[in-house]
Each structure stands twice: as structure tokens, then as C-alpha cells.
Amino acid sequence: IEIIALVSGSRETPVWCMVYDDLVYEHEADIFANQQKFVKPLTAYDTFIANVEAGNPEYLTIKSIIESYNLKITAKRTNGSLCAISTAEYIYRKYGYHVLDNTIALCIATWQGDPNSLVSNILKGVAKLLVAYGDRLDMNMFKEKIGMYSLREIIRNANARNNGSLGYAESMLAVYNKRMKYPLPISKLYNKRS
């Protein structure tokens, strides 16, 4: 209302409002999540939390996966938190429950919960590897080999290779394949499914 008064130069300008009566908390949160994204830009975090409050089963499932690793969902990167919530949603929708679960587990185990390991490109890169190679990707070997490298090295190599998460997946695969008798073929990363 203040913005309209400022623009029109009058506090007497009529403003169209929608008033809801007798809403339960969950329904109000659902209206907020779905209407506000068209009115003002909301962060992925705001939309996610509103959908959780609305009781949306998909968002509750994603939240339970994240919290099962003693992580909090936050808007900013901190220790013990995941702030790349839109990436978690993306992985869950595109690849499913188990890939999101394994992705988070692998990132935490490989880099001992470093908050920089739970950023968008790392999460998507690990998910791409899990989808492309499935059971051929030995998770214990991944943790051992990739964990020996700092995240800075992985990020530097990824930026030199390709844009986005594919570069991160390529960088991690190159480290994983070092000194392997039968390395995983990089061509599988470019499959349409991953």
C-alpha cells in the first residue's frame, strides 16, 4: 500500500485486495507459496518452507531426507546445513528419492560434512555420476579417492573443464578413474538420462 501511495501521490488511491476468512494454517501457507511467487520474487528457501508448512508431501519427503543426515535447511551456507534447496528439489524430481539420498550421503561422507560440499554444482555433479554409472560406481572407493582432494582442487578442475555440474562430474570422474585398471567411460556422463 505504501508503494501505491508513493507512486500515485495519494493515500486515497483504491487498492484491490483479496481477503480470506477461516483458513487453517496449512491452507494459508499453500496460498502464500503459490500466490506470492507471482507477486514478488521469493527465494527457493521461502517457497520450500511455505510448501513444507502447507503439508505438501513431496517437500516433506525432501525435508525428511535432508534432516535424516542431521542437516538443517537454511537460506545461507553454514556448518550442518544445506542451502541449495532448489538443487535438492531438482534431484528429487528428476532422479528420485534414492539418488537424492545417496547424493547427500556421499557428499557428507566424502568431505566430512564441509558446507562447501553441499552446494548446487557438487550435488548435481555427484547425482549425475550416480545416475550415469549406478552400481559400477563404488561408493567406498569414491569416498576414498575423491576425499583425498580438497574441494578447491575439484572446483578449479571443474571450472577448467566444462560449465556447471557436468564439469564437476567430469572432474570427480577423472580423479575416481586415476590408476584404475578398468576406468569408467566418460561418455556415459553425456547420456540423455543423466
Question: What is the meaning of each model-derived region?
Answer:
Residues I1-R11:
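A sequence-level detector for short glycine-anchored, His/Arg-bearing signature motifs
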Residues S10-S194:
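Solvent-exposed functional surfaces
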